[in-house]
Amino acid sequence: MTALVISEHDNSELKGATLNTITAAQKLDDEIHLLVAGSNCNSVAESAATIEGVSKVLYVDSPEYENFLAENISLLIKNISNDYSSILAPATTNGKNLMPRVAALLDVAQISDISAVESKDTFQRPIYAGNCIATVKSSDEVKVITVRTTAFDPVSPESGSAEILKLEEVNDAGISQFIKDELAESDRPELTAADVIISGGRGMQNGENFNLLEGIADKLGAAIGASRAAVDSGFVPNDYQVGQTGKIVAPNLY
């Protein structure tokens, strides 16, 4: 059987979470196809074709997919889903927005945030803020899955040689509109992918004291995180937040 992995990218570069999701897909199916949907994203499709374990890249280039609107992408996935036994995406903000729509369109139950694959229909996922692990079994013909990427090692981005198949599938649901991006720029590693994280809590007392963490973070090449208490106190923005209600991380040093 064949798995379809939904790639995460910004129309110029593939996100690392895609590589971890492919590892999860390899535990389910013998063949893996990777969907690259976007606008002017040919470079993403070309880099996707070199990923280890991917046999085919489905490349769809249209303005309707430029901003990864879940309403449009979910229709695309539904229309190409017939050949797949499982459809996987990273459990990122985009993945969590997209995959429930896909599951609804296919009339199946989504399997959320898996951390291990026991068999082709049985999975583990954390519950109760990660304090327990649930084992879940799906009887649906098509499995729609989001993957906790920190639980799976990434595949190599360079050792593959996949076919690129360009599709002319264009879908505009007409019910949502992209307004703008508000991006926080930083020279530090992305929190969810960082090997080293320095995190502050309520004990930092105020936002200015978080500046004290920057020097050592720069020396270590670390990302800076924060507890929910620090975020709720207004010390730092919520994109710093680590944990169940924030970002899921798996650094080598915390």
Predicted regions and their residues:
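N-terminal glycine-rich FAD/FM-binding segment characteristic of electron-transfer flavoproteins
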Residues: 1-254
